[in-house]
Regions:
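Transmembrane alpha-helical segments of polytopic membrane transport and secretion proteins
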Residues: 1-44, 270-290
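Periplasmic/extracellular loop-to-transmembrane helix junction in inner-membrane transport proteins
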Residues: 23-29, 56-104
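N-terminal signal-anchor transmembrane alpha helix
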Residues: 34-60
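Transmembrane-helix boundary motif in ABC transporter permease subunits
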Residues: 101-131
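Short cytoplasmic-facing helical segments at TM-TM junctions of multi-pass membrane proteins
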Residues: 129, 172-214, 238, 242
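Generic hydrophobic transmembrane alpha-helix motif, especially the helices
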Residues: 132-168, 175-176
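Transmembrane alpha-helices
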Residues: 159, 163, 195-228, 252, ...
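Hydrophobic alpha-helical transmembrane segments of polytopic membrane proteins
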Residues: 238-274
Length: 290
């Protein structure tokens, strides 16, 4: 009962502070169907422009070799052939397994460490300087060392992704934990909530949007670095597919690999947004009660 008493009033307060986004959307007059149509038109224009430039280069201006800029329909046919042969699925599975392992480890470490440092000033002063020293170093700078330390197998790729994905999650988590509205914490404390109840029912829910943002950034970065890792030491994966196609000037194959990475990134972003909506469903419920 105490937890419920803490959760509902505080949820109403948080909901009130986040109620401006729908208003912004209504002022712009952009409903969900309108947004979907605009996005579809944008994609259509992109493919039409791509097709037009490819066609003009191949048959009119001939600025460079037409093989270097295949038309969208040619890339689509190549992708369908690769999918039918099972080659594309093999590369997708290899990259996804590496990304999910590295991203999962990074998410666990980033959320736990970020939460611990956000809740403890002592730990923050002890640990954060070391992490801040490592954070500006580009992940690619550590790739050769990862290969030397862990070999050319899966361990080096997973460790590389873990390192790259850790910092976005850690940074957004610690910021979300540290900068929770103190009014919410005082409101929960005035209702008799314990420190544990305040953390689970106030601090963590309030920090969840930051954490989800970090997860989205980290997942995109995970695919960025796995492609680089698969350029160097791999016999499968989307990075290997792109690099192997580059060697033989198979531009359509390269674009298929790049397109698949883009599609996976979009799907992951949608799933993480759905997860955020489920985790924060209490906000909309509280807004309705308010």
């Amino acid at each position: 009962m105490e937890a419920e008493a803490v959760r509902q009033p505080v949820a109403v307060s948080v909901a009130a502070t986040s109620s401006t986004a729908p208003a912004r959307i209504s002022r712009r007059g952009l409903t969900r169907p309108t947004v979907m149509v605009l996005r579809a038109v944008s994609l259509l224009l992109f493919f039409v422009l791509w097709w037009g430039v490819s066609l003009l280069n191949a048959h009119v201006f001939k600025v460079f070799n037409p093989i270097l800029l295949p038309a969208p329909d040619e890339v689509l046919r190549t992708g369908m052939k690769m999918a039918a042969s099972g080659e594309l699925l093999r590369h997708i599975t290899a990259s996804l397994s590496r990304v999910l392992w590295g991203f999962g480890i990074a998410a666990a470490l980033g959320i736990v460490v970020g939460t611990a440092l956000g809740r403890s000033r002592l730990l923050e002063h002890l640990v954060e300087p070391m992490l801040e020293m490592l954070r500006p170093i580009p992940p690619l700078a550590f790739l050769p060392m990862m290969v030397l330390w862990f070999g050319i197998g899966e361990a080096s790729k997973v460790a590389f992704i873990t390192y790259a994905a850790f910092f976005p999650i850690f940074t957004t988590t610690i910021e979300g934990i540290k900068y929770v509205d103190p009014v919410l914490i005082r409101a929960a404390a005035s209702l008799g909530a314990t420190e544990r109840q305040i953390f689970w029912h106030v601090v963590l829910p309030a920090a969840t949007p930051n954490i989800i943002t970090g997860l989205r950034l980290a997942f995109g970065l995970s695919f960025f670095v796995i492609v680089a890792a698969e350029f160097i030491a791999a016999d499968s994966g989307l990075g290997f597919l792109i690099n192997d196609a580059r060697t033989f000037f198979l531009v359509s194959n390269m674009l298929v690999g790049a397109a698949v990475i883009g599609v996976i990134g979009v799907l992951a972003n949608v799933l993480l947004r759905k997860l955020e909506g489920r985790l924060l469903r209490w906000r909309s419920q509280a807004r309705g009660q308010a």
